[in-house]
Design a protein with these regions (language model features):
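Actinobacteria-biased recognition of intrinsically disordered, low-complexity terminal regions
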Residues: 1-34, 38, 161-173
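Short amphipathic alpha-helical segments
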Residues: 21, 25, 67-70, 150
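N-terminal interaction modules that seed assembly of large macromolecular complexes
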Residues: 29-73
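Short, surface-exposed beta-edge/turn micro-motifs
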Residues: 43-48, 86-88, 117-121
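Hydrophobic side chains in beta-strands
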Residues: 50-51, 93, 125-126
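Short acidic, S/G/P-rich loop/turn micro-motifs used as interaction or catalytic elements
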Residues: 55, 97-99, 142
Length: 173
C-alpha cells in the first residue's frame, strides 16, 4: 500500500548530525546581534532565544525575549526559562573592562581604571556548551572569543540557568 501524496514516507535512514560547533554559532550570533544592537551602553542585560534552523549547517536566528538591569536577576526570572525552548540562548551585557594585573586581577573598579574600555559581551549557551564573544567600543571591528573557559559568578549563573534549571516553583496564596 502506498502512502497518500500528502503524507511523507518515513525512512529508517540515520540523519547526519548537525554541526553544532558552539564557538562558530556564538560568533555568528554575535555578528547578527552586532548589526542589530548599535550600542555599548545598554540599559540592562538582554536575553535572546536562538534558533539554529532546520539545515545541517546552523544559521542562528536570535529572538529577543527579555531585558533586566541585573543580569543575575534576568537569568533567575521565571519567564527567562522560555529561552530553553530554543536551540540556544544568548545573554548580552555591556559595561566597562580594564586590563588585568600580573595576578590576573583588576585593580579597583573597571569603570574607574585609567585604561578602561566599553565592552559588549555575548555569551551563547546550548546543550553542546558555552562560548562567548566580546567587542570593545574603541575597536568595534575586532572580536575576542572564548570557547567556554570563562570562570566566575556570571559563568556559574549561565551554566545553572541552562544546565540546572529549577524543577518547579511553589506558589503560595
Amino acid at each position: 500500500m502506498q502512502a497518500p501524496p500528502h503524507i511523507a514516507a518515513m525512512t529508517t535512514e540515520e540523519v547526519p548530525p548537525r554541526d553544532t560547533d558552539i564557538m562558530q554559532i556564538a560568533v555568528e550570533t554575535e555578528q547578527r546581534l552586532h548589526h542589530a544592537i548599535d550600542s555599548f551602553e545598554l540599559p540592562g542585560a538582554r536575553l535572546y532565544g536562538v534558533n539554529l534552523g532546520d539545515s545541517l549547517e546552523p544559521h542562528p536566528a536570535p529572538c529577543f525575549l527579555s531585558q533586566h538591569p541585573d543580569v543575575y536577576e534576568l537569568l533567575e526570572a521565571p519567564g527567562s526559562g522560555l529561552a530553553r525552548m530554543f536551540d540556544a540562548a544568548a545573554i548580552v551585557t555591556t559595561g566597562w573592562a580594564a586590563p588585568l594585573d600580573e595576578n590576573g586581577n583588576v585593580e579597583g573598579a573597571p569603570s574607574r581604571h585609567a585604561q578602561r574600555r566599553r565592552v559588549r559581551l555575548i555569551v551563547l549557551v546550548a546543550n553542546s556548551g558555552v562560548a562567548s564573544v566580546l567587542r570593545f567600543a574603541d575597536e568595534p571591528d575586532d572580536v575576542v572569543t572564548d570557547p567556554g573557559s570563562a570562570t566566575g559568578s556570571l559563568a556559574e549563573a549561565i551554566n545553572r540557568f541552562w544546565f540546572d534549571p529549577p524543577v518547579g516553583q511553589t506558589v503560595t496564596a
